[in-house]
From Swiss-Prot:
PROSITE patterns: AAA
Pfam families, per the entry: AAA, AAA_lid_3, MIT, Vps4_C
Source species taxonomy: Eukaryota, Amoebozoa, Evosea, Eumycetozoa, Dictyostelia
Annotated Low complexity bias: 86-101
One GO BP annotation of this record: response to bacterium
Official protein name in the record: Vacuolar protein sorting-associated protein 4
Comment block on domains: The MIT domain may serve as an adapter for the ESCRT-III complex.
Originating gene: vps4
InterPro entries to which the protein is assigned, alphabetical: AAA+_ATPase (IPR003593), AAA_lid_3 (IPR041569), ATPase_AAA_core (IPR003959), ATPase_AAA_CS (IPR003960), MIT_dom (IPR007330), MIT_dom_sf (IPR036181), MT-severing_AAA_ATPase (IPR050304), P-loop_NTPase (IPR027417)
Organism, as annotated: Dictyostelium discoideum (Social amoeba)
Topology of this chain in the membrane: Peripheral membrane protein
């Protein structure tokens, strides 16, 4: 019983330490971290379970590292003039001296952990445009219109969004995997001229107690500093799932911070759009779901969109397909997602490679030169043993520069269709439809 009390005491003190750490009372936080380490060490001494020992050791190392970081920061601060720790502009001394400070000096005054978080979040800003245009997204016409309404129009025509007409602040894209939710986000990043943050759960969740909610707060602070920002959160259910008795304190704190920031309590959230994607919308916390004013179902593509997807994925790869072939493939792939069609085409594109690999006979043909299509040159290509021009050989006998690979045919696609199956079943789709009827709207 004694060792349990030691551990409970250590946890109690380290929670106080993280609270002081969050409040930027670093001296008190350092003292409490050191005190908690003494209790953790004592608990470790009396712990009999090897598994529990390993957990305690890992936590002890984490809090020791944080204590050392704080000590290093406090030692440096002793040699500097008083400043607002973390750049708090409301501090009178910080305001008096802040006017002439450079960005470099601000970085030096910032707590090392705050600076580290800032740098980490800065890497999530999309600086290179993904080069995905609206037209590159097959189908999803309604979803694209909603996103233009929420993102493009408020930036291009700000005079239209005054008074009671406000742009949407939260949009949730949900649907089966591989239907284009993240691809739509790339199109938004390409089309807008404002700052685009692309966040995944790994950018937010850290091993440090109290650090994750700090990252959430800092993310929104950075977004407010930039004029007109979009925060895209992929797999948002990993961060904001329904609350239950089994979830950790850290997960609960992350959700609470998201709710505070998305609600704009005590902060101006104008000019920030939170765009999120999830495959399991029913798993989201109810309060988080309410923050997303628009909940758009990104369902499976319709036949016209599927035909366009086949064309996009095949692209410039040599092929013999015509419009009727694309329509036939679209009709045969009912229930396939965009990702499934991508996998199917990828397999079909490999069929000519397999034909070369398995061929026992090749023939000589005349075809436009790769270097200069206006010039005809001799190549060899696989053929059936019964072809009048067939010569018995394998791919090992061929000069690589003389090989002419077969073009992709409708037969290749049909062959791959027998192998590549859809990844979503009817039961899954029924659940999405039920959620859409209750809480969302169709984006197709």
């Amino acid at each position: 019983m004694g060792d349990v009390n030691f551990l409970q005491k250590a946890i109690q003190i380290v929670q106080q330490a993280t609270e002081q750490d969050n409040a930027k009372n670093y001296a008190e936080a350092h003292r409490l971290y050191i005190q908690s380490l003494e209790w953790f060490t004592t608990a470790l001494k009396y712990e009999k379970s090897e598994r529990s020992k390993a957990t305690i050791k890992a936590k002890t190392l984490e809090y020791l590292q944080r204590a050392e970081q704080l000590k290093e920061y406090l030692d440096k601060s002793k040699n500097k003039k008083p400043v607002a720790v973390g750049g708090n502009k409301s501090n009178s001394a910080g305001s008096a001296n802040g006017a002439g400070k450079s960005a470099k000096e601000d970085d030096e005054d910032m707590d090392p952990e705050d600076k580290k978080r800032n740098d980490s979040l800065s890497s999530s800003i999309v600086t290179t445009k993904p080069n995905v245009k609206w037209d590159d997204v097959a189908g999803l016409y309604q979803a694209k219109e909603y996103l233009k309404e929420a993102v493009i129009f408020p930036i291009k025509f700000p005079q239209m969004f005054t008074g009671n007409r406000k742009p949407w602040k939260g949009i949730l894209l949900y649907g089966p995997p591989g239907t284009g939710k993240s691809y739509l986000a790339k199109a938004v990043a390409t089309e807008i001229s404002s700052t685009f943050f692309s966040i995944s759960p790994s950018d937010i969740v850290t091993k440090w107690l109290g650090d994750s909610e700090k990252l959430v707060k800092q993310l929104f602070e950075m977004a407010r500093e930039k004029n007109n920002s979009v925060i895209f959160i992929d797999e948002v259910d990993s961060l904001c799932s329904s609350r239950n008795d089994q979830e950790s304190e850290s997960a609960r704190r992350i959700k609470t911070e998201f709710l505070i920031q998305m609600n704009g309590v005590g902060n101006d959230s104008d000019g920030i759009l939170v765009l999120a994607a999830t495959n399991i919308p029913w798993g989201l916390d109810l309060a988080i779901r309410r923050r997303f004013e628009k909940r758009i179902y990104i369902g499976l593509p319709e036949p016209q969109a599927r035909a366009k997807m086949f064309q996009i994925h095949i692209g410039s790869t040599p092929n013999t397909l015509v419009q009727a072939d694309y329509k036939k493939l679209a009709d045969l792939t009912e229930g396939y997602s965009g990702s499934d069609i991508g996998s199917l085409v990828k397999d079909a594109i490999m069929q000519p490679v397999r034909a070369v690999q398995c061929a026992t006979h090749f023939k000589q043909i005349r075809a436009p030169s790769r270097e200069d299509p206006s010039v005809m040159t001799d190549y060899v290509t696989p053929c059936s043993p019964g072809d009048p021009l067939a010569q018995e050989m394998t791919w090992m006998d061929i000069d690589p520069t003389k090989l002419k690979e077969p073009e992709i045919t409708i037969a290749d696609c049909l062959k791959s269709l027998r192998v590549i199956k859809p990844s979503v079943n009817k039961a899954d789709l029924d659940r999405y439809v039920e959620f859409t009827n209750d809480f969302g709207q169709d984006g197709v």
